Structure formats: structure tokens, C-alpha cells
């Protein structure tokens, strides 16, 4: 039987076995999982993409043609 895939915990770098019974994967622990969640909530992480436009209000839009 082959050995399970081992990856690094994205938070602390500890080795983590990539197995279906590891409820924290890809993290090594609940603590590392919550640290990562907090970083997303604090907007320390972002998914790259196009810059969002400023809020546009309906009064700023040209009238629609019927």
C-alpha cells in the first residue's frame, strides 16, 4: 500500500497527511485553521482579480430606454 500524501500546513508549515479522516486538512490543527480564517476575516488574504468599481447608485446611471 502506498504512503499517504504529505503536505505542509499553510499556517505553520508542519507536515500534514492528506487523508479523508483528517478533519483539519490542509491544516494540522483546529488552531491553525482558525488562524487562517481570522486572516481572511481581517482581509490579510485576497483572491486576485479585477479591481472592483466604486459603488454605483441608480441615480448615477443614465436613464433606460423603453
Curated annotation (Swiss-Prot):
GO molecular function per UniProt: DNA topoisomerase type II (double strand cut, ATP-hydrolyzing) inhibitor activity; zinc ion binding
InterPro entries from the UniProt entry: DNA_gyrase_inhibitor_YacG, Znf_NHR/GATA
Cofactor(s) the record lists: Zn(2+)
Listed GO biological process terms: regulation of DNA-templated transcription
Pfam families for the chain: YacG
Cofactor note: Binds 1 zinc ion.
Domain of life (superkingdom): Bacteria
Keywords, in A-Z order: Metal-binding, Zinc
Binding site for Zn(2+): 9, 12, 28, 32
PANTHER family reported in the protein's UniProt record: DNA GYRASE INHIBITOR YACG
Subunit structure, interactors included: Interacts with GyrB.
Function: Inhibits all the catalytic activities of DNA gyrase by preventing its interaction with DNA. Acts by binding directly to the C-terminal domain of GyrB, which probably disrupts DNA binding by the gyrase.
Family: Belongs to the DNA gyrase inhibitor YacG family.
Designated name of the protein: DNA gyrase inhibitor YacG
Organism: Pseudomonas aeruginosa (strain ATCC 15692 / DSM 22644 / CIP 104116 / JCM 14847 / LMG 12228 / 1C / PRS 101 / PAO1)
Gene name linked to the record: yacG
Amino acid at each position: 500500500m502506498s504512503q499517504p500524501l504529505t503536505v505542509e500546513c499553510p499556517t505553520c508549515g508542519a507536515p500534514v497527511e492528506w487523508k479523508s479522516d483528517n478533519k483539519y486538512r490542509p491544516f494540522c490543527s483546529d488552531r491553525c485553521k482558525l488562524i487562517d480564517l481570522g486572516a481572511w476575516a481581517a482581509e490579510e488574504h485576497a483572491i486576485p482579480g479585477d479591481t472592483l468599481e466604486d459603488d454605483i447608485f441608480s441615480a448615477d446611471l443614465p436613464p433606460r430606454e423603453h
